[in-house]
């Protein structure tokens, strides 16, 4: 499980993928954690099956390798459990969740 401190440090680790699985409308209402990429939960399975160039075109970042460090975040820490399950079922082995997710981030950042 990732901590607030680890998530805050993600911009210093370009090899780490911080994936926010909230819907786009939620991000527009609340904002997002810096360095995160948005892949809504209902798109995640399909997104992780895209080829590298299609993934980069859609999400603006190269597709994670199966062993790339991935941290999933959402609003309150529930959807990340499903995201973790999806990624692991596709062979991604270095996956953790940020249980505090946006709610903890916003509180600690004073947002």
Curated annotation (Swiss-Prot):
SMART domains the UniProt entry points to: RHOD (SM00450)
Domain Rhodanese as annotated: residue spans: 12-110
Pfam family, one: Rhodanese
Keyword set, alphabetical order: Stress response
Keyword Lipid metabolism: no
Presence of the UniProt keyword Plastid in the record: no
The organism's place on the tree of life at top rank: Eukaryota
Annotated protein name in UniProt: Rhodanese domain-containing protein CG4456
């Amino acid at each position: 499980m990732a901590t607030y401190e680890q998530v805050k440090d993600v911009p210093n680790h370009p090899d780490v993928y911080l994936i926010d699985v909230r819907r786009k409308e939620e991000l527009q209402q609340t904002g997002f954690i810096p360095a995160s990429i948005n892949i809504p939960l209902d798109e995640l399975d399909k997104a992780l099956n895209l080829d590298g160039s299609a993934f980069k075109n859609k999400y603006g970042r190269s597709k994670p390798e199966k062993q790339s460090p991935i941290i999933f975040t959402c609003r309150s820490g529930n959807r990340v459990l499903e995201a973790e399950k999806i990624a692991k079922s596709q062979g991604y082995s270095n996956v953790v969740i940020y249980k505090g997710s946006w709610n903890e981030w916003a509180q600690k950042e004073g947002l």
